[in-house]
Curated annotation (Swiss-Prot):
Binding site for Ca(2+) 1: 95, 206, 214, 216
Compartment(s): Virion; Host endoplasmic reticulum lumen
Main location class: virion
Protein name: Outer capsid glycoprotein VP7
Region (GPR motif): 253-255
Species this chain originates from: Rotavirus A (strain RVA/Human/Indonesia/69M/1980/G8P4[10]) (RV-A)
UniProt subunit comment: Homotrimer; disulfide-linked. 2 Ca(2+) ions bound at each subunit interface in the trimer hold the trimer together. Interacts with the intermediate capsid protein VP6. Interacts with the outer capsid protein VP5*.
One GO MF term: metal ion binding
Pfam families membership: VP7
Glycan attachment points: 69, 238
Keywords tagged on the record: Calcium, Capsid protein, Disulfide bond, Glycoprotein, Host endoplasmic reticulum, Host-virus interaction, Metal-binding, Outer capsid protein, Signal, T=13 icosahedral capsid protein, Virion
Length: 326
């Protein structure tokens, strides 16, 4: 009987020792795996660029987010610059490698190869239909033309400011502008805008709401129109909707990642005459040179000084999104 008890006790002790050994072995294996995993994470982390995700926060006001101005002479290694110019510049220069030359010149000012994009446009009117300013910093060169001075002024007002816009259903509703910052912006191949002011009985003032030929014409066959009417008055609006779209917009403030350089002309455009526009002449400047090579040399030479008057933004102007919210 005692032999059986001794055997049982011995068996129990052996199992206990064996279990203890197994647990220690498992612990050592887990420690080995964990330590090596942590070592792998430490080694790999510096080479991985990942996005941190958090809760969704409500967006209010403008979707543009400004960053602190770059105020030191170090190279702009993480920024992009778009330079927009009329296509006539390419015709005059007539050099297939001129962009490579400019790229090398920008490199001397701290802009790495590949960070500067040169984009041409046909003319101011065409550029007004679909302005797309995608880079961190955007500089638009406008050659002065007395016949398109008003088009240049409206385009400058559009791209140098942030706008919050909503669609307008002019077939069903009357509209009024609530304050000086409230404008109607139209874009398209051909925009003819007519308005009929209404009295408190919704009868036309000097016009018939049922006859568009009696409406007051404020724009004729233009590609970009920023319409300003008397505040607090309802209007019946007529627009060539087949070739033009119209939006009810609110000017939010300056779009500080855009600068406009006027090339030539005896007068410099001054959009600050608009009471809704804060002084921003630093981002509206003029270069008086006849040859485009001289213009580009000047831009390269002063690019960093121009950038100092601007602020980097996370979002830039795209006319498709502009119509709804910027």
């Amino acid at each position: 009987m005692y032999g059986i008890e001794y055997t049982t006790t011995l068996t129990f002790l052996i199992l206990l020792v064996l279990l203890n050994y197994i647990l220690k072995s498992i612990t050592r294996i887990m420690d080995y795996i964990l330590y090596h995993f942590l070592l792998f994470i430490v080694i790999v982390t510096p080479f991985v660029n990942s996005q941190n995700y958090g809760i969704n926060l409500p967006i209010t006001g403008s979707m543009d987010t400004n960053y602190q101005n770059v105020s030191n002479p170090e190279p702009f290694l993480t920024s992009t610059l778009c330079l927009y110019y009329p296509v006539e510049a390419e015709t005059e220069i007539a050099d297939s490698s001129w962009k490579d030359t400019l790229s090398q010149l920008f490199l001397t000012k701290g802009w790495p190869t590949g960070s500067v994009y040169l984009k041409s446009y046909t003319d101011i009117a065409t550029f007004s239909i679909n302005p797309q300013l995608y880079c961190d910093y955007n500089i638009v060169l406008m050659k002065y033309n007395a016949n398109s001075e008003l088009d240049m002024s409206e385009l400058a007002d559009l791209i140098l400011n942030e706008w919050l816009c909503n669609p307008m259903d002019i077939a069903l509703y009357y509209y009024q502008q609530t304050d000086e910052a409230n404008k109607w912006i139209s874009m398209g191949d051909s925009c003819t805008i007519k308005v009929c002011p209404l009295n408190t009985q919704t009868l036309g003032i000097g016009c018939l709401t049922t006859d568009t030929t009696t409406f007051e014409e404020v724009a004729t066959a233009e590609k970009l129109v920023i319409t300003d009417v008397v505040d607090g008055v309802n209007y019946k609006i007529n627009v060539t909707t087949t070739t033009c779209t119209i939006r009810n917009c609110k000017k939010l403030g300056p779009r500080e990642n855009v600068a406009v350089i006027q090339v030539g002309g005896s007068n410099i455009l001054d959009i600050t005459a608009d009471p809704t526009t804060a002084p921003q002449t630093e981002r509206m400047m003029r270069i008086n040179w006849k040859k485009w090579w001289q213009v580009f040399y000047t831009v390269v030479d002063y690019v960093n000084q121009i950038i100092q008057t601007m602020s980097k933004r996370s979002r830039s102007l795209d006319s498709a999104s502009f119509y709804y919210r910027i």
